[in-house]
Amino acid sequence: MPLAAELKSRGLPITRSRRAIAEFLDASTAALSAIEIIDHLHSQGITVNKTTVYRELDILEREHLVVELDMGDGLKRYELSPRQHHHHLF
């Protein structure tokens, strides 16, 4: 199930930024940092601040829809949880 649909099924409102983050995570072939998500959204003309992206990622993690990864480079990255999983390249 697409991430945005899963959020909706859990009763969470689907804001423009939440939908955009969910769609980018769904389409990604790699685990993403918050900065990569912000840069992508800005390139798509979606204005979102860093706090919003971190808040959304926190919600997705609390709902067990994404997992936080530590790749050893000091950046936290996020990918779909195993229940939402599709293959990512590291």
Task: Give names to the regions the model predicted.
Residues 14-17:
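Short helix-coil-helix linker/hinge
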Residues 36-42, 53:
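A short acidic, leucine-rich amphipathic alpha-helix
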Residues 19-24:
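Pre-recognition alpha-helix immediately N-terminal to the DNA-recognition helix
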Residues 53-63:
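Basic amphipathic alpha-helical segments that dock to polyanions
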Residues 27-33:
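Short capping segments at the starts of secondary-structure elements
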Residues 63-90:
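Non-DNA-binding regulatory cores of transcription-related proteins
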Residues 1-11:
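Short, Lys/Arg-enriched N-terminal segment that forms or immediately precedes the first helix
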